[in-house]
Regions:
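Mixed-charge, glycine-accented linear interaction segment located at domain edges/termini
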Residues: 141-176
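Hydrophobic/aromatic-rich structural module bridging two neighboring secondary-structure elements via a short loop
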Residues: 65-109
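Amphipathic/hydrophobic helical signal segments and adjacent flexible N-terminal regions
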Residues: 1-75, 156-159
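An exposed acidic His-Trp-rich patch
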Residues: 95, 102-152
């Protein structure tokens, strides 16, 4: 995340452009509905880690520009729904926002899962970047992780990292 000195006037709203897609920077190629069939989950069990393949459905829709006084974000609202091959029951569900701040090059990912965990991961990239990494760490006030009491006690998440790669064929992938 790149530091940025915002104006002293924190009340005057930034002037957004109506064309969100043209202002998404490195997030623009991610907009749309995607399906991935090569996922592998590593799940902790008492007898050791279990590896499960999965199919992921990922939808990213442009949202109107968002302002916090002089701060201006363009973004994508997303939902990812994951099932195991041949199953209909949800294996993992996640919602949130991918946000791009053109003035700084900062990218934020806010995510929440219905098992009681949320985070904000942050990073920085050029508008035309084909790869970028976002990170969150437990205890941070700006890119942190918060969990329900059971997860905090039994399965503490110390950090989160995701690297996104935009491919020449118009697709994208991530590693976390």
């Amino acid at each position: 995340m790149k530091d940025f000195q915002y104006p002293d006037d924190i009340y005057t709203e930034a002037e957004p452009d109506e064309n969100t897609l043209a202002n998404l920077g490195p997030l623009a190629p991610m907009a749309g509905i995607w399906e991935g069939k090569r996922g592998l989950d590593i799940n902790p069990k008492a007898e050791g880690a279990v590896k499960d393949p999965y199919i992921e459905y990922y939808e990213l829709q442009p949202i109107d520009a968002q302002t916090n006084g002089p701060q201006l974000y363009y973004g994508l609202r997303y939902h990812t729904h994951i099932v195991q091959p041949g199953e209909v029951e949800t294996f993992h569900d996640q919602v949130g926002y991918w946000l791009w701040e053109p003035a700084t090059g900062n990218i934020s990912l806010s995510l929440s899962i219905p098992r009681g965990q949320s985070l904000i991961a942050t990073g920085n990239a050029a508008a035309d970047a084909k790869e970028f990494t976002l990170k969150a760490v437990r205890g941070s006030l700006t890119n942190g992780i918060i969990s329900n009491p059971f997860l905090e006690q039994s399965f503490t998440t110390e950090s989160y990292e995701i690297t996104v790669k935009i491919h020449e064929d118009g697709t994208w992938s991530y590693d976390q």
